Amino acid sequence: VELSEHLKPLQSYIGKTFKGEFANSTPENPTYDIQYWERALNGSAIKITHSVNNGEYGGESMIMWDAKVESLVSWYFTTAGFYTQATMIIENDKLVSYEKVTGNENGITKVRATINLLSNGELHTKSEYLQNGKWVDGHEIYYKEAPNAKVLFK
Protein backbone atom coordinates (compact mmCIF):
# COMPACT_ATOMS: atom_id res chain seq x y z
CA VAL A 1 0.00 0.00 0.00
CA GLU A 2 1.74 3.06 -1.34
CA LEU A 3 2.22 6.59 -0.15
CA SER A 4 2.38 9.57 -2.49
CA GLU A 5 5.81 10.33 -3.93
CA HIS A 6 6.59 13.14 -1.46
CA LEU A 7 5.75 10.97 1.57
CA LYS A 8 7.69 7.86 0.48
CA PRO A 9 10.74 8.62 2.68
CA LEU A 10 8.42 8.00 5.67
CA GLN A 11 7.02 4.68 4.37
CA SER A 12 8.93 2.51 6.86
CA TYR A 13 7.08 4.14 9.79
CA ILE A 14 3.58 3.44 8.49
CA GLY A 15 1.55 0.96 10.53
CA LYS A 16 3.95 1.15 13.47
CA THR A 17 3.53 2.22 17.07
CA PHE A 18 6.36 3.88 18.98
CA LYS A 19 6.83 4.54 22.69
CA GLY A 20 9.27 7.07 24.07
CA GLU A 21 10.19 8.48 27.43
CA PHE A 22 10.65 12.22 27.80
CA ALA A 23 14.22 13.31 28.59
CA ASN A 24 12.99 14.95 31.82
CA SER A 25 11.04 11.87 32.95
CA THR A 26 11.90 10.52 36.41
CA PRO A 27 11.09 7.24 38.20
CA GLU A 28 8.86 9.23 40.59
CA ASN A 29 7.12 11.07 37.76
CA PRO A 30 7.44 9.04 34.54
CA THR A 31 6.38 10.82 31.37
CA TYR A 32 6.07 8.87 28.14
CA ASP A 33 4.51 9.33 24.73
CA ILE A 34 2.99 6.72 22.44
CA GLN A 35 2.46 7.47 18.77
CA TYR A 36 0.96 5.56 15.88
CA TRP A 37 1.72 6.33 12.22
CA GLU A 38 -0.79 5.39 9.52
CA ARG A 39 -1.46 5.90 5.84
CA ALA A 40 -4.45 8.18 5.25
CA LEU A 41 -6.52 9.62 2.41
CA ASN A 42 -5.56 6.97 -0.16
CA GLY A 43 -1.86 7.50 0.51
CA SER A 44 -1.87 11.25 -0.01
CA ALA A 45 -1.44 11.82 3.75
CA ILE A 46 0.09 10.39 6.90
CA LYS A 47 -1.88 10.53 10.13
CA ILE A 48 0.05 10.42 13.42
CA THR A 49 -1.96 9.96 16.60
CA HIS A 50 -0.23 10.27 19.97
CA SER A 51 -0.97 10.40 23.68
CA VAL A 52 1.13 11.27 26.71
CA ASN A 53 0.65 9.17 29.86
CA ASN A 54 -2.50 7.40 28.62
CA GLY A 55 -4.36 10.54 27.62
CA GLU A 56 -3.16 13.28 29.99
CA TYR A 57 -2.40 15.07 26.72
CA GLY A 58 -2.56 14.02 23.10
CA GLY A 59 -3.16 14.99 19.55
CA GLU A 60 -3.52 14.08 15.92
CA SER A 61 -1.39 15.24 13.00
CA MET A 62 -2.01 15.05 9.28
CA ILE A 63 0.94 15.45 6.90
CA MET A 64 0.37 16.07 3.17
CA TRP A 65 2.09 17.53 0.13
CA ASP A 66 0.84 21.00 -0.81
CA ALA A 67 1.56 21.60 -4.50
CA LYS A 68 0.76 25.30 -4.17
CA VAL A 69 3.60 25.94 -1.71
CA GLU A 70 5.68 22.99 -3.00
CA SER A 71 6.21 21.64 0.50
CA LEU A 72 4.98 19.07 2.95
CA VAL A 73 2.48 20.68 5.30
CA SER A 74 0.85 19.48 8.50
CA TRP A 75 -1.97 20.25 10.86
CA TYR A 76 -1.81 19.19 14.51
CA PHE A 77 -4.86 19.27 16.79
CA THR A 78 -4.52 18.74 20.56
CA THR A 79 -6.56 17.76 23.58
CA ALA A 80 -5.39 21.04 25.15
CA GLY A 81 -7.49 22.99 22.64
CA PHE A 82 -4.73 24.53 20.54
CA TYR A 83 -3.60 23.59 17.06
CA THR A 84 -0.62 24.13 14.79
CA GLN A 85 -0.11 24.53 11.06
CA ALA A 86 3.35 23.72 9.72
CA THR A 87 5.55 23.46 6.71
CA MET A 88 7.89 20.48 6.75
CA ILE A 89 10.96 19.30 4.90
CA ILE A 90 12.71 15.96 4.79
CA GLU A 91 16.49 16.31 4.76
CA ASN A 92 19.24 13.87 5.76
CA ASP A 93 16.77 11.42 7.35
CA LYS A 94 15.19 14.20 9.38
CA LEU A 95 11.65 15.52 9.22
CA VAL A 96 11.88 19.21 10.18
CA SER A 97 8.76 21.25 10.90
CA TYR A 98 8.18 24.96 11.35
CA GLU A 99 4.86 25.38 13.14
CA LYS A 100 2.55 28.32 13.76
CA VAL A 101 0.58 27.80 17.00
CA THR A 102 -2.98 29.04 17.56
CA GLY A 103 -4.70 29.11 20.96
CA ASN A 104 -1.88 28.08 23.32
CA GLU A 105 -2.49 29.27 26.90
CA ASN A 106 1.24 29.38 27.78
CA GLY A 107 2.25 32.07 25.29
CA ILE A 108 3.73 29.66 22.72
CA THR A 109 3.27 31.03 19.19
CA LYS A 110 5.76 28.98 17.14
CA VAL A 111 7.46 25.57 17.32
CA ARG A 112 10.56 24.24 15.56
CA ALA A 113 10.65 20.46 15.73
CA THR A 114 12.88 17.75 14.31
CA ILE A 115 12.12 14.05 14.02
CA ASN A 116 15.29 12.07 13.35
CA LEU A 117 14.51 8.88 11.45
CA LEU A 118 17.25 6.68 12.89
CA SER A 119 18.84 3.88 10.84
CA ASN A 120 17.76 1.29 13.43
CA GLY A 121 14.08 2.19 12.85
CA GLU A 122 13.79 4.24 16.03
CA LEU A 123 12.81 7.91 16.28
CA HIS A 124 14.34 10.86 18.11
CA THR A 125 12.28 14.04 18.49
CA LYS A 126 13.38 17.43 19.73
CA SER A 127 11.51 20.72 19.79
CA GLU A 128 11.93 24.39 20.64
CA TYR A 129 9.13 26.83 21.42
CA LEU A 130 8.80 30.56 20.79
CA GLN A 131 7.25 31.44 24.15
CA ASN A 132 6.51 35.03 25.10
CA GLY A 133 8.91 36.19 22.37
CA LYS A 134 11.88 33.95 23.32
CA TRP A 135 13.03 30.59 21.95
CA VAL A 136 13.12 27.97 24.74
CA ASP A 137 13.92 24.27 24.75
CA GLY A 138 10.87 22.08 24.36
CA HIS A 139 10.74 18.34 24.75
CA GLU A 140 13.19 15.65 23.67
CA ILE A 141 12.20 11.99 23.32
CA TYR A 142 13.84 8.80 22.06
CA TYR A 143 11.26 6.32 20.76
CA LYS A 144 11.48 2.59 20.20
CA GLU A 145 8.99 0.55 18.23
CA ALA A 146 6.37 -0.84 20.64
CA PRO A 147 3.86 -2.98 18.71
CA ASN A 148 1.72 -3.70 21.79
CA ALA A 149 1.52 -0.09 23.03
CA LYS A 150 -1.78 1.73 22.51
CA VAL A 151 -2.56 5.40 21.95
CA LEU A 152 -5.19 6.15 24.60
CA PHE A 153 -7.43 9.14 25.21
CA LYS A 154 -9.60 9.82 28.27
Give the label of every model feature segment:
Residues V1-K154:
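Hydrophobic small-molecule pocket/channel-lining residues, especially in calycin-type beta-barrels
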